[in-house]
UniProtKB/Swiss-Prot annotation:
The keyword Lipoprotein does not apply. Residues 1-47 are annotated as: Disordered. The gene is HAK1. This is High affinity potassium transporter. Major high-affinity potassium uptake protein. Residues 17-27 have a biased composition (Low complexity). The keyword Transmembrane helix applies. The chain crosses the membrane at residues 58-78, 102-122, 191-211, 239-259, 261-281, 307-327, 341-361, 387-407, 435-455, 464-484, 492-512, 517-537. Belongs to the HAK/KUP transporter (TC 2.A.72) family.
Amino acid sequence: MSDSQSNKQNQGEDDNNVSSSIESNENYPFRLNDEESEPQSSTTESMLKAKKQSWRQVLMLGFSSLGAIYGDIGTSPLYVLNSIKYPNSSPTEEDIYGAISIIFYLFTFIVIFKYILIVLFLGTNDGEGGQVAIYAKIARSLKIGPKGVHIPGSPEKTDLELLARAETSSSFKSSNLFLNKASGFKTNPKLIKFISKFILFGCFFGCSLVMSDGLLTPTTSVLSAIAGIQIANPSFNDVLAVSEVVLIVLFLIQQFGSNKISFTFAPIIFLWLIGLIISGIYNIVKFHPAVFKSLSPYYAIQLLKHSGIDVFSGAMLSITGTEAMFADVGHFGRLPIQLTLTLFVYPALIICYLGQGAYIIKHPEALSNPFFYSIPGGLNSWIYWVMFVLATLSTIIASQALILGVFSITSQLINLDCFPNFKIIHVSKKYAGKVYIPAINWLLMIGVCATTAGFKNSNNVTAAYGLGITLDFLVTSSLIMVCMTYVYNWNILIPITYALIFLPLEVIMVISNLKKITHGAWFPLMMSGIFMMFLSFWRWARSRKVNQDFKTRIRIGDLYPELKKQPPQSETVDLNDRGRPMSIVNSSNEELVEYGVTLPKILKTNNNQLKVQSKFGLMNLKKYDGIAIMYNDSSVHTLNSPNTVPQVYGKLVSSFSSIPSVFIFCSIRVLSIPTVPNDERVLIGSMKIPGHYRCIIRYGFMEEILIDKELNNHILNSIPDINELAIKFNLNNKCILTKPCTIPILHIFENNLIRSHDYSSEEHETKNPLVKCKRFIRKILINHIFSPIYSDFQSNGKFLKISDEDEESEKKMFLGGVVRI
């Protein structure tokens, strides 16, 4: 399992530290002794539950969010008023009132009412935002998520309870919802099937739009910021070259993490917004106090009558960055964003727009550049140059929201198995949502630099800007209405009311921006289409691979027929007090119970005479003294499928009929806490097969995934079979936690080659050219795109630390075959 794979399972599930007994009933058949006791709360469980933010943290995060989220929406006053289409070349007082009125109501309805009061309350999932979060929330509620994936936020039994299961009726069932056909239209199976496809499409399309916006926003912001230098120095002609350098620097500093970057940028945006407030108040008081009339919707309606819906293509630039704000929830939290935007950013921007309107009414000639002309003191004053510098810096910072948004949604897509397993770096111990993805950062940097070189100047980019953002608004509204209906089970009238209020406005904004397609808006649409196709292809290929994994898992009873009717082995525990050195050899049962070591009830079957079903019939399974640890890429199989073993294990025992006397199936999980205490890191559960165990090794999201000799000893000292092995190897009391154990250990990793179905047999022969073409494309995509990328992210045992090369070659084994999907 690679570092990136470890982060895929980054999820916060409650874990109990049981060192005494597990209640013996039909759900929990394993127990340490006959006495029942209540599970004790572990440190891990307490840390998982302690996620509430103090007011001090809220205020600090709110301030930090200024430097990461509001640069885009906060710099809109630079260009919005002069981007709006007016009925006359020289707008009248009513025209200016109308423009400000449209900006005010657009901002209030979309940003405040829709996102702050509705979407941020209903659409977040497990502390994350964006369309992926809404999708995950709906999929979790309807149980229609990707097969074999734990959706963040799902209530689930503890690792300990899951390891304790010996029987399950769902090992080979999909996670689809079993609906009663008579339960009404809302839960009709056909409708649910449509909903599952619709929300996945919406999720992928919305993410693709954000990613394409991630190419345009940095390009727009940096080009416009550097072009501003020409106002002070008209002879400056190196806008493109300087912009490329600034962009490269901007992406280079992302490795320091959103925590440091946002806190560094926050004072700049804070001063910028303060400057907007001062400038706005000054212009209102001095030039036209009656500008507050523009807050009446009458003037917005009048401007729409005279100019049509094309007004929205310019006015919507005042709300760019809103969708990125929603995607960035994981970096700062919902409440800090809501408070900062509502109480500070929103008033500052509205006051600034009112001030610009007041100035233009008295100075119509200033419409070409209303922001700089309306700065108190006039051009070349010291206030002008202060605001000029702040405007340049703030505009550069504006791209930060989209960059962080791309990191957030990519991280969520990886966790849902909808994206290649890129390495995720958590940059904060306190907040799991603050992530940095190096590969995405460098790919985004290359894409943005190429986009900047292609568009060359800010005017060309601005002409292409806006369509993707308005489509994103529409996608979010569609998903949030499904969320209202199926997650919150609200009356159908509520989503209908929501649709009547917001959808017409968003559809109008989309229509008003369609004219931009010929002026460059085709580019974000094209990039969205490319991203959409890749996400859909990856999800399709991964679903085929997961289905194949489930299909090829082997039932224990089929592999070992004599175990079909055997009772389960008994205990599952975690390693309590793991910091103390202990030897299992010569220890009494009472001592083992005290240390929380697994105590399986040995089956009546003779461990050395177990028969295995092979292609040659039943054969005796021979066991030699030693230990094998087989690593699974996902803990899902290890936890949720106690009746089965991986296909590669079946191949091993049925082909060679000889395995080590102790066999451990091991998986690694990453929890949504920064660190896991050493005494709660490892959980061991016995299996039906004598001498076989299931093991979960747990890490926090800030910890390096590393298995060394000491951790191996932690695992081995919890297995009773180690007692007999230690005696055979004359170890006596030497196999203790503080020293490396010398019992031979073989580490087995699954390494398969993914290939497309061959379709070469007679039953698959066809003369249909379309079918042949489809199969050829399928083969190219799977064999030459999916398979190489998938192989790059397989673990290959990188997390297993063996310093000596010769020892590594002896102790690591890679088993697999060709997997056809």
